[in-house]
Amino acid sequence: MKIWVDADACPGVIKEILFRVADRAKVEVTLVANHSMRIPPSRFIKMVTVPSGFDVADDEIVKRLDAGDLVITADIPLASEVIDKGGIALNPRGELYTVQNIKSILNMRDFMDTMRASGVQTGGPAAIGASEKQAFGNQLDRFVTKYHKL
């Protein structure tokens, strides 16, 4: 089991949580981004740099993903591909994407895109707060605990 991170848009505070978990639980965490990032020295933390371009990092994650791997992403279409391939998708706010909820989340995303395209100001998500960090950490701990029981 590996953890893949859609790192270009992943908040720094979430990466820090992942770095700590990688060493504590001895789980491989791989950041995938279109530019190099600073990562702590650890045999469990890796960086994959891909060329710039639309969905290049997403495509690389899907290509390398094995069933049962966890992907950290706020990209809903990527989360859908991860689920289709048998992976698990978690967003940085601690929301788990599942077979049961991904279609409705995709539909809402498409609706909001249509609203924005028609000129409606929808605003962006709020900054990640303490409750979202805790929700993310709790979901991550559940995943790692389940992995270690296998």
Swiss-Prot record:
List the protein's name. Answer: UPF0178 protein Ssed_1350
Q: Which InterPro entries match?
A: UPF0178 (IPR003791)
PANTHER family in the record: UPF0178 PROTEIN YAII (PTHR35146:SF1)
Q: Which residues form the signal peptide?
A: none
Q: Which domain of life is it from?
A: Bacteria
TM spans, by residue? Answer: none
Family from the record: Belongs to the UPF0178 family.
